[in-house]
Amino acid sequence: MTSATSPIILKWDPKSLEIRTLTVERLLEPLVTQVTTLVNTSNKGPSGKKKGRSKKAHVLAASVEQATQNFLEKGDQIAKESQDLKEELVAAVEDVRKQGETMRIASSEFADDPCSSVKRGTMVRAARALLSAVTRLLILADMADVMRLLSHLKIVEEALEAVKNATNEQDLANRFKEFGKEMVKLNYVAARRQQELKDPHCRDEMAAARGALKKNATMLYTASQAFLRHPDVAATRANRDYVFKQVQEAIAGISNAAQATSPTDENKGHTGIGELAAALNEFDNKIILDPMTFSEARFRPSLEERLESIISGAALMADSSCTRDDRRKRIVAECKRAVRQALQDLLSEYMNNTGRKEKGDPLNIAIDKMTKKTRDLRRQLRKAVMDHISDSFLETNVPLLVLIEAAKSGNEKEVKEYAQVFREHANKLVEVANLACSISNNEEGVKLVRMAATQIDSLCPQVINAALTLAARPQSKVAQDNMDVFKDQWEKQVRVLTEAVDDITSVDDFLSVSENHILEDVNKCVIALQEGDVDTLDRTAGAIRGRAARVIHIINAEMENYETGVYTEKVLEATKLLSETVMPRFAEQVEVAIEALSANVPQPFEENEFIDASRLVYDGVRDIRKAVLMIRTPEELEDDSDFEQEDYDVRSRTSVQTEDDQLIAGQSARAIMAQLPQEEKAKIAEQVEIFHQEKSKLDAEVAKWDDSGNDIIVLAKQMCMIMMEMTDFTRGKGPLKNTSDVINAAKKIAEAGSRMDKLARAVADQCPDSACKQDLLAYLQRIALYCHQLNICSKVKAEVQNLGGELIVSGLDSATSLIQAAKNLMNAVVLTVKASYVASTKYQKVYGTAAVNSPVVSWKMKAPEKKPLVKREKPEEYQTRVRRGSQKKHISPVQALSEFKAMDSF
């Protein structure tokens, strides 16, 4: 770093012809094009045409001469105006003039005799010399611009030194005002230079340095003022020196970026993808070998060493404090058994295929298995990291607020105790951020996270110093202002780090972990409620609120990346329900519970109300996750399939239970159903096809009606959709993962069936036709029966048997029973819809619409697609319709309904 009195040093070799700005490149490009075109005029070999003068070559030579003249005029002007590098610029202009004259003569002679190789060679050498001279002139002009920027930097450095040497607060105010003016000028010049820089890395460095300068300038005044007001408090000097150092480093950053010099070693450490991610990527590449050249002695030690290095990194992550026990077990199992065994199997297959030209099927299968196991390990590691992120980036401002409150009270001992907590919190943020980087392939995102983490690491001690200053002088407004500035800076930096970490992690992983953590916290709340532990209840409920708020914030931000449509509407509807309905109810129940438990004489309250409110929070987050996953591909859903509900040890008789007892090897019930034998899958597919035929009947029926004002149609559609999800589950597809999901779906169908029963019975009660009424009631009995059957069959699960050490999966009977029950229910719903309509028509026909109460539901045909007002029709069709109308034949409602054809667009 140059001092305020040192001369300006340009870290740039004047003899270098490296182009560093877009402007030089743009100015040079036309001349390069013209010279290249001229040189290549006769580059196609000897011509059979008569030798003579080339008109094209003369035109090109004239254009080169004119372009050179333009450069000379601009060069003369720059040399006259420039205060820096004046001698070098004048010399460069003369060199361009000299080389331009040489080029003019050589190009003219070449144009007169374009077939002469000697003259062409002379012109090529002259062209190269001219381009070098012009390039050097432009680069010197560019260097002159950099010198002007460095002059501004020197002025700012001097103003900064003046601020540092201020002797009183008034002197500080005056000097800081001057510093601010010079800062504005510097920012303008630096911004222009940033736009001109050719290297994206240098542009990023310039932007970062400008941002750091602006950010620290805010703290510069309050830190200096606090030092002048309380020089006896050591923490004030530490604050001031830190800010001055940050400003000086920002100025140095602008200088380096402007000259496009190499980044510092510190910045080099920020580049590149995560270490563990890079190791896994390299391992995946190294396992693809040529059997012809495979040598066990050469490749086995190398691959085993690489894998052990990966396993060591995974073990460190597994042993970290925030990693859940079950996650740790999964990672260890994945490393010790699955991945190592897959590598040994792969090496064995390579040995069997040694010397062959083509890879055999067993070898390809072994490669796929190895790749799948490393992919599974990646997922487990991402999930472990997300455990840390979910816990550490929750209520990030609490340690800071506690520290500030202690400082305001003037209790220095307490401040030192809370400072240790704050320091541990900051260290945890940095540690978790680095963990997130270690498994990320997002190079740019990793760089941002590491830079933000570095800022957090350096800012943490200064926040503590500001708190110590306030604790020593709690009545001082200057100390309070200084604390506020550092507080604001800390909160901004934490937000930057949080957003950067969110950018390199998966939303799907975040939602999966958040769902499991909220379930864990809900169960803790229930246990605390039963044990009367108010502190644990309050703290855990706060964690639930924080997790839910994070989910809402992240998903709302994620939806901004999508075009507005049905998908985003569904997701935002789920987040809105959680934020505006579910969370207020949960907060209310927590308050009621805490008040009741905190009373001198514990007051009775409805425990089930609290449990229901807690369950709704979990369901709300789960619904958001389901909505987000709606557009995922089957492969992406498969990647998420092994992240099921956690098997927590903490349980109580009233805690929220959502786990499945049939999970094996960390797989979901849906994933197990997908592993059924092909014969059973084929039979299930036949049953599903029959179900789809029944579904098409219901689709045709409900498509006829406008569902506004007709809840029977709405309920029929809902039941149809849920039944489709249940049948998809039997094929190992769809949004339902576990038996608990299928059971919940069956409950929803039963609820919808009960509501349909209530509505249809109201229709039947108003129907005067006893036959229609009896038919409708009979169909309703079928719905009740089939809903009950579906509830029983919803406990579908694949049976897993261990025969000879091999897992045999079967589940045909339970799957076909579920599909059959769904088909029967679908048929009953179709008949109920038809019978409800018929009963409604009988009712209106006998009593008339004016003499009765409003109908239970409104049966209106869906409006047809818009068509031309005048339609050309064949005469015979027109006559036929008139004759049919004139017969006045009575048509029963059922017949009319069956003849009605819904259009595809309905």
Swiss-Prot record:
Its biological purpose: May function as a linker between cadherin adhesion receptors and the cytoskeleton to regulate cell-cell adhesion and differentiation in the nervous system.
Signal peptide: none
Biased amino acid composition, Basic residues: 881-891
Gene3D superfamilies: 6.10.250.2510, Alpha-catenin/vinculin-like (1.20.120.230)
Subunit structure: Interacts with CDH1 and CDH2.
Key words of the record: Cell adhesion, Cell junction, Cell membrane, Cell projection, Cytoplasm, Cytoskeleton, Developmental protein, Differentiation, Membrane, Nucleus
Protein name, UniProt field: Catenin alpha-2
A Pfam family matched in the record: Vinculin
Stated family: Belongs to the vinculin/alpha-catenin family.
Any GO CC annotation of this UniProt entry: actin cytoskeleton
Membrane topology annotation: Peripheral membrane protein
Bias (Basic and acidic residues): 866-880
Tissue: Mainly in the nervous system (at protein level).
GO molecular function: actin filament binding; beta-catenin binding; cadherin binding; structural molecule activity
Annotated region (Disordered), positions in chain: 866-892
